[in-house]
Amino acid sequence: MADLLSSLKNLPNSSGVYQYFDKNRQLLYIGKAKNLKKRIKSYFSIRNNEITPNHRASLRIQMMVKQIAFLETILVENEQDALILENSLIKQLKPKYNILLRDDKTYPYIYMDFSTDFPIPLITRKILKQPGVKYFGPFTSGAKDILDSLYELLPLVQKKNCIKDKKACIFYQIERCKAPCENKITKEEYLKIAKECLEMIENKDRLIKELELKMERLSNNLRFEEALIYRDRIAKIQKIAPFTCMDLAKLYDLDIFAFYGASNKAVLVKMFMRGGKIISSAFEKIHSLNGFDTDEAMKQAIINHYQSHLPLMPEQILLNACSNETLKELQEFISHQYSKKIALSIPKKGDKLALIEIAMKNAQEIFSQEKTSNEDLILEEARSLFKLECMPYRVEIFDTSHHSSSQCVGGMVVYENNAFQKNSYRRYHLKGSDEYTQMSELLTRRALDFAKEPPPNLWVIDGGRAQLNIALEILKSSGSFVEVIAISKEKRDSKAYRSKGGAKDIIHTPSDTFKLLPSDKRLQWVQKLRDESHRYAINFHRSTKLKNMKQIALLKEKGIGEASVKKLLDYFGSFEAIEKASEQEKNAVLKKRI
């Protein structure tokens, strides 16, 4: 405590970010302040050189303060820089008492550029600087389905570079385009089609009606497979905005954020209103063993969403709850980011309060559906047995695969919300010559990506204690808090025992080794995770090997033998690099005379 007391007596009056650590140097919390001295001292009460938590703080904060043994600060120029740095560090380091919102993606917009002679609908996530661009969105899902439907229903120019070709293509022959490239339609006639396209984007009911008519025609002509494609597309477009029945008399452009939480679970709902209609919505489920802070959740949600410059900003941002201090901070952040004032408010009456109530009702409904399942009970039992500090709500599982140290690859699979999240899987080509260096490379590359993809609660490693220790060292050097377990086969005479029907799995934690019965649900849960990572890595290895065999066959056709292929691979690193190399470079490696 002497170090902490000394730090508290020498705090700067500058803007910056502060970090609290426990006695083991585990990161507890990251915060930011306009005045570090005032903010940090507000957590503590100091009497006779004895430090205690401020009794006015919440129980959650008091519990955290009791664990603080060290603090560090990072000074920045102003409060805006501190706000952005705080958000970045929380995502990268995942402190124990901070809430981590993972949904920080920029949603797509549909746009049409009317400064061109023949405008077409396209998708963007960025602001386009040319004049005459009209945006629609954001779309949390279904933007591509809308786009595909527009191109199939209307004779639009099908590709951006079509006009440059000056020659009609197959789309003209199948009556999907009017061939403006050959002047078969005037600009004025095409503009009518473009305006019809605008109407369908703005009025999804009309778009859906046209799709239903097309589906019916296909079905009547016994083209059932094509009709099914339209049926699925209609379903996706209908899901984009479940609140489209809500039309307000005033043409509001609003973004709406509602947060609802209790115990160790919470839900954040986002709704986007344009022209008085809700055009899309999204939600995120959040878990935390240490309770929730609405201010912190709202702050992170707003920064995540508006940190990238968006093509279409609302007139106003509505929140269901937030302190005046945080509201002011976020207002300044938005104004600074977009160089204009966009109001943030917590509505107390009228239409806008009704919108917040609808968002809250949906958040509560999603929350109520989060019933405790058998899987949740197994997670709790696994956390208790393996002495994990955090509930393993999000898990990353790693495995490597190779054949005689060739075609070395690694795979990472992700498990969250009681399901494998295949969109988050990652594949890696590895250079290591043995399983230890391969695993080290795999885990290091993942840790280096924590700033872009926040770390999970738990890593599961397919390997023994050596691989577990490698993971712990990498995480220690990264500064991020992630817990680790490993699973390996039982060994006899220093070899993994894999006899049919007799292979036993052992689970390793930093402090223990567990040999559980095959019927143990906790073991089966870890095995399920390991088996999926193994399947993923093996499949990637096989596809890599097949691709390499094809490349070798092509080189053999050019008169290059296997020994020469190995030399070229050792030098250039990949078949793609060999293809790009000149004959002179390849001959130099093979020491051939030209």
Curated annotation (Swiss-Prot):
This is UvrABC system protein C. It comes from Helicobacter pylori (strain ATCC 700392 / 26695). GO terms for biological process: DNA damage response; nucleotide-excision repair; SOS response. Its main location: cytoplasm. Gene3D superfamilies: 5' to 3' exonuclease, C-terminal subdomain (1.10.150.20), GIY-YIG endonuclease (3.40.1440.10), UVR domain (4.10.860.10), UvrC, RNAse H endonuclease domain (3.30.420.340). Keywords: Cytoplasm, DNA damage, DNA excision, DNA repair, Excision nuclease, SOS response. PANTHER family: UVRABC SYSTEM PROTEIN C, UVRC/OXIDOREDUCTASE. Interacts with UvrB in an incision complex.
